[in-house]
């Protein structure tokens, strides 16, 4: 298979727009277009609120969204887990203000629920200086490591932005055939 999806993750993708700002929504629309080209089963939510708790969200391996201060919706349901290798980010000014309390912010909540990689902000960087999700995904698909992709997605280096995950992680480095041979090893709740 020649598609980048054949070189990486196995699961569903979710993009949650906020109808809040043309710039941020534009990044997420571009992210959704990239995911579509990759061939993922994709759900795009264009409602102003974040995903509803009743939204279908199973085997999530890619999640890009914004804009609420703390994790909510399906991410708080008992038993919710990201699929192995998941890359997840939620744009918010203080998404990584604390990593010790998953109920406060997004970064800690995403990691606590199994995300392998995320980026966030410890303090207000303003939208233009946060990680651009479309650039992050584009770099990862190209084969960049997580740290390279996070660097490319950040318009200016700042103490406000952080990366959580193995800096050498390359989510699109494992072939689809290899993933499918290991599929039976996944717990039923994570098997796509």
Where are these regions (language model features)?
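Short, small-residue-biased leader/transition segments that mark boundaries at the very start
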Residues: 1-3
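Structural alpha-beta junctions
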Residues: 5-10, 30-46, 110-118
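Extended, regular secondary-structure scaffolds
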Residues: 9-11, 21-22
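Catalytic-core segments of thiol-dependent peptidases
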Residues: 16-102
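Short Asp/Glu-rich motifs
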Residues: 54, 129, 158
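C-terminal soluble interaction/assembly domains
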Residues: 80-153
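Caspase-like cysteine protease fold
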Residues: 142-192
